[in-house]
Amino acid sequence: MPDERTGGKAALKDRVAKLGLQFLRRTLGELVAIRECVHACIEGDVSAIAQLERITHRIHGTGLTFGFPGISQHAADLERIAQAALRSPIGDPEMLEKLEAGARRLADEVEQTATAAGVPIQS
């Protein structure tokens, strides 16, 4: 029979796993906001770049917390690109390409990780 500590550790591990799945579901939903931000950046909306930076910063930290290093790394990469975009001229084609590519890489990683975890992806 497990003692209280062992049972408590198992319950904590189960709770963290459930929170990780919630993170994946939420992040799948945030991919829509990320795509909208990138599109708005292409249209010249500087506030969308700042919003993109905030979203990716949150995904970066939370992904690492719940054991999704690939998601965390791609979010960190996109966060750095967004920070650089804030210092670049609005509409810089090279920067816009980097934003689009970074968003694509993050989306691919989130979708692959969610699929592997059994989280359904809405199209």
Regions of interest found by a model, annotated:
Residues L31, C37, H74-A76:
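Amphipathic alpha-helical interaction segments
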Residues V46-A84:
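Extended, amphipathic alpha-helices with heptad-repeat/coiled-coil or helix-bundle character
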Residues R15-F23, I42-E43, T62-P69:
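A ubiquitous short alpha-helical element
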Residues A33-A50:
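Helix-loop segments that flank and shape redox-cofactor active sites
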Residues T6-A11, H39, A50-R54, A84:
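Short, charged/polar, low-complexity loop and linker segments
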